[in-house]
Structure formats: structure tokens, C-alpha cells
Amino acid sequence: MKLKFIFLILFFIIGNSIGIKISKEINKIKLNDISIDGEILLNKSSDSSSSQSSKIINIWPMPKKVLNGDITVYISPHFQFTTNLTKSTTLKKAMDRYYKLIFTEDSKSHSGISILNEIKILVKSEDETLQIGFDESYEIYIDDSGDDGGKIIAETVYGAIRGLETLYQMIGFDYQREYYQIKHCPWIIQDSPRYPHRGVMLDTSRHFYSVDVLKEFIEALAYNKFNVFHWHAVDSQSFPLTSTTFPKITKGSWSSQEIYSTRDIKEIIQHAKEYGIRVELEIDMPGHAYSWGIGYPSVLPANFSHSIQCQQPCPTECNIPLDVSSKESYVIAMGLLEEFNGASMFNESFFHIGGDEVAYSCWNNSLRIVDWMKRENISSFQDAAIFFEIKAIEQLIQLGKTPVMWEDAYLLFGSSGITEKLPEEVVVQIYHDPLLALNTTRDGYKTLQSPYWPYYLDNPSVDWEKVYEFEPSNGIHEKRLRLLLGGETCMWSELVDASNLFAKVFPRAFATAERLWFSIENSNSTTFAKPRLERFRCFLLERGIGAAPLNSTSPDDPNSCYSS
């Protein structure tokens, strides 16, 4: 039996290492007491499947590698977090935050011998830069005696934050005996994400969300170990972002109370940073630009309202594009890109410029656009759109940013008769057929998956099981998988506002979070996921996040959250 266990430990250490030396830490942990009966041994495997029991490893999203035992360690009333990175305000805030989230009750001392007094958070790097591919790996070690304390080891503060979230889910309170405890010790967890880009898109144009709601939304993303808030800030319906360069642009907001000031924007970005969340701003262009024209009418096509094909009801659609023949369109569009990509604003390297659903019919009735096309030797409206998009892409590249665009741009540049190639720097975000990723990766483009089925959460017929069963890498050649950066689930806000946002997004986004974090070979594994998902929902309810029940918009009957 000992030989079998030693082999298991060696396999665990050697296989799929996340780059942190752990041999010294393992030697400090008493492993001889770990149970290796069939069920728990199966749970220790790195190849999780639907046949596994999730009674022991009740963590969401599932960690990459786990070893655990059957001993309960009790937590001292004087427990504390300590760290080697004492100068990091980000880590200090995270430690304080999780301490308050975990220890909400008064606890008593326990007479048992297994007492945990401290967890050391050891971080290798002081670099707190948030960019695509930042290191989120972490390791957790909890002794079965408590004598040696516990450890969270990470390359960056953001890995430590992910580890603290896992620890939160491991600690429980015994209300009868009045003490905190960690069951199934000792624990060894080695974890790192499957994809570097794991996000949720939220549309704040169709309905406005306050800064406090957006901050709470960002917190919910971090609890799920997402790392991107894709902020679809503006659209045809409203332009709520304050611009110091073009102050009249917010005339396109719903009202003077529904505007994000420069201070608001910076506050949201800073809050996200403290939770390890990148904020990727999207300003869609040249389509969906009606709101731009409220303050600057010259950027919209002349006589568009008289064009039968362009008569779209507002505010439900209003998909009026920019006038790509207007100098003002370029001045404002390029100026906004420069302003919102400044060092004092969005430091994020990805910037989304949309490029989707350009309504060419709105250009039909504009003599100015037709004359401009003749002068520029532009033969089609598709070429006119490409002319504009190239300018926007080049502007972002010059600013040192990575352009992100919806799949329409990839399809436009690849359409018949178009000789211009989509610049290789562009990241393509797919929102129709996910198999389009076979083509985008074949052509060398970095790709994000956001197929409307099942990643569009405004579709009420999509349940969490359908989201969970979707495999973003299906069909992509193994050699091109590196080009699949991950994906985003999307919440369009036509029928959603602050009153129902969290119930609409969660728990379905939970499923996306795990599939983008943890590699599951057997995609039909909802049975394996459901008990953990139900428990994780309870954790979010405890933290004030109004996640809906798994299969309904409201509870079916009186019941316990944890036992339902």
C-alpha cells in the first residue's frame, strides 16, 4: 500500500507541474494518513470525469490536481493570514477581504490536537501587471496536524487571490460546536487555468448599471475565477462614457444621471485590478453608432432616416453606422481610441472595436458617401467598411494595443473580391458557429469563443447544462490550439437591468467559468458538476450575489440551499 501511495505522490508531482518547486513543501506535510480507497483515489486523479464522486472535492471551478485525506483540522480563534509580500496593497486587501468573508462567526477553541493557527501566503513575483497570460497558478498545502500551518504558494498576487477563493470553499463552520474547520486534510492542490482569457461580456448601453452594481459584478466574476470583464460600454442605444476630448458625446446617454464619469471609469478599473480582473473596453465601430450622432450629427450618414432600408425602430434597434466618408467620423473615432487607451485610463492591452453588423443599407441614400467612394476608388460598401476598419486597427496597433473584433471583420476581409487581408494582430471573437474557429486558427488568428448558442445568456432557453457541455476547442487541430485564447459568455441587456442581472448571468456563467478553467475530457459531465455547482451557488448567495437556482428563475418550494 505504501509503494502504491508513493507512486501516486511521484506521479502527482511530476505530471503537469505548474512551475513552482514544491518538494520541500511536500516533505513538511504528513502524507501517510491520506486515505487511498478507491473512491477518494479516483477523486485525486487529474483526469476528472462524470463517474467521479464530488463529495470530497467540493470546489468550483475544479482544481487541476488535488490530493486529500480524511482528517479534520480545526482552526484557531486566533488564526491569521501572513505573507512574504508585505508591501503589496493588492494582496493585503485580498487577505483582509477573505478573512472577513470566511470568519463571520465567533468561534471557540477546540481541544483536538489538529489546530491550524496560520496560513502563509508566499508570492514569488512583485509584478502586479494585468495583461493577457498573467500567471494565476497557485498551490495549497494544509497539514493534517495543523502544526506546520498551511501555505498558499503563487507566482503572482493574482494566483494567491485565486488560491484564497479555493480556500474559502474549503473552510466550514460547525454551528453546534462553534468552531471553524477544514475537512479531508491533508490537502495538496496544484492549480492553474486552462485558458488565459476567461470572461463575461456585459452590455451597459441598452440598460445602465451603476458603478456599485458593476463592482459587485466584477466581484462575482472573481469568485468564479474569471479574469476578464468585457465592458460593452456603448451601442446605438446610448453612449454613457464620458470623454474629455469630445464632451458632447454623452448627449447620447439615456440621461444625465446615467453616465460614467472619468472618475467612475478609473474606480471600476482599479476595483477590477484588486480582484485580478482585466477590463476590456469595447467601443463598437463603424456600426451601432446612432448614439454618437446625438451630440455630433455629422458622424451619421446624411438622409439615413429617409432611406427605407435604414428605418430601424429606436431604441430597440437603431443600428445606424458611422458615415465613413465624414472626416468628423475619423477624428472622433480615432480620438476616442487614443483617449481611452491612454496610460491614465485603460492599461489593458486588448481593446475591442466591434466591427459587427454594419448596416450598409443606411449608406444607400447618402450622396456624400457615394461621391466619396468614387473619389477614393472604392467599389462597394464592404470595401468602404474595410477602409474604416483598417484605420481603426492601425490606430490601436500604433497605440500598442491588440485589436479585438467580432467575427464579421474576419468574414468581411475574407469575402469574395476583397484583396485586403485582416491584419494578423487582430483577435477574432466568434459569436455564431463555433466551428468557425477551425478557419480562424487555420489562418493564424488568435480566437475567442462566444457562440450565441450556448454563450448568449439573453437566450432564456439556454440552461447551465448546455453551457457546461459546450467544448470550445472542438475540431481545432492540436497544433493550433495555442491560438484559442479562451472565450466569453455574453449578457446583452435589452431585457436585463440591475433588478435581474445576477439571476440572468448566474448560475449559467458558472458553467463557462469551469469549462474555461478546468479541462474536462468527458463533456457530458453535468452529473459530476451539479452537486458542486449547487454548493457554489450557496456560497455566492452568502456573499450577496443573487444567483438563480440551477433550473429555474425562482425557488420551487421551501428548502435549504445546501441540502436542496
From Swiss-Prot:
It is an enzyme of class 3 (hydrolase). GO terms for molecular function: beta-N-acetylhexosaminidase activity. It holds the Pfam family Glycohydro_20b2. It is found in: Lysosome. Residues 1-19 form the signal peptide. Its main location: other. The keyword Hydrolase applies. Glycans are attached at residues 43, 84, 303, 347, 364, 377, 439, 524, 551. GO terms for cellular component: lysosome; membrane. GO terms for biological process: carbohydrate metabolic process; glycosaminoglycan metabolic process; N-glycan processing. CDD domains: GH20_HexA_HexB-like. Belongs to the glycosyl hydrolase 20 family. This is Beta-hexosaminidase subunit B2. The lineage of its organism: Eukaryota, Amoebozoa, Evosea, Eumycetozoa, Dictyostelia.
